């Protein structure tokens, strides 16, 4: 699963996401993309599940790019632990996804197959998504 190799600070405050994506909102590498229609955090496990679903569908043809990276730590205290004694340990890593973010890109396959693969990936994610083709975003 994806996670940072090294971070300046191990733990971070939660924070909130708002607004639309200013960066990462255009298809840069592939012909097809999966764009977020909502704002949310996506875990490294969800990204990996979506990647596996796509690559299994397209088999050997084509190439997949993951355009989001989980670099925000999510901490959690163990179950049945009393409050206090400091902040919990890092449980998993999240990727911030804003409205309009291109999360995955694909090329080297026909459009129908790409759409099916992206649909499978979309079902693994906690946000509503839209399949886009590079010619649509010009």
Swiss-Prot record:
Positions with biased composition (Basic residues): 1-15
Keywords from the named record: Ribonucleoprotein, Ribosomal protein, RNA-binding, rRNA-binding, tRNA-binding
Keyword flag RNA-binding: yes
GO CC annotations on file: cytosolic large ribosomal subunit
Residue ranges of the TM segments: none
PROSITE patterns with a match to the protein in the record: RIBOSOMAL_L16_1, RIBOSOMAL_L16_2
Gene Ontology annotations of biological process type: translation
GO MF: rRNA binding; structural constituent of ribosome; tRNA binding
Ranges where the record places region Disordered: 1-21
Highest taxon above the source species: Bacteria
Residue pairs linked by disulfide bridges in the UniProt entry: none
Assembly and binders: Part of the 50S ribosomal subunit.
PANTHER family attached to this UniProt entry: 50S/60S RIBOSOMAL PROTEIN L16, LARGE RIBOSOMAL SUBUNIT PROTEIN UL16M
Function, in words: Binds 23S rRNA and is also seen to make contacts with the A and possibly P site tRNAs.
Family statement: Belongs to the universal ribosomal protein uL16 family.
Protein's recorded name: Large ribosomal subunit protein uL16
Lineage summary: Bacteria, Pseudomonadati, Spirochaetota, Spirochaetia, Spirochaetales
């Amino acid at each position: 699963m994806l996670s940072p190799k090294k971070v300046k600070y191990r733990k971070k405050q939660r924070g909130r996401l708002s607004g639309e994506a200013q960066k990462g909102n255009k298809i840069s590498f592939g012909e097809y993309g999966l764009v977020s229609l909502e704002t949310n955090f996506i875990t490294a496990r969800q990204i990996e599940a979506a990647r596996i679903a796509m690559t299994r569908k397209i088999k050997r043809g084509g190439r997949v790019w993951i355009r989001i990276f989980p670099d925000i730590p999510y901490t959690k205290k163990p179950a049945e632990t009393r409050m206090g004694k400091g902040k919990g340990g890092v449980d998993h890593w999240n990727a911030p996804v804003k409205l309009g973010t291109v999360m995955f890109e694909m090329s080297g396959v026909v459009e129908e197959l790409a759409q099916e693969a992206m649909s499978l990936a979309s079902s693994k994610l906690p946000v509503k998504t839209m399949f886009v083709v590079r010619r649509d975003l010009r």
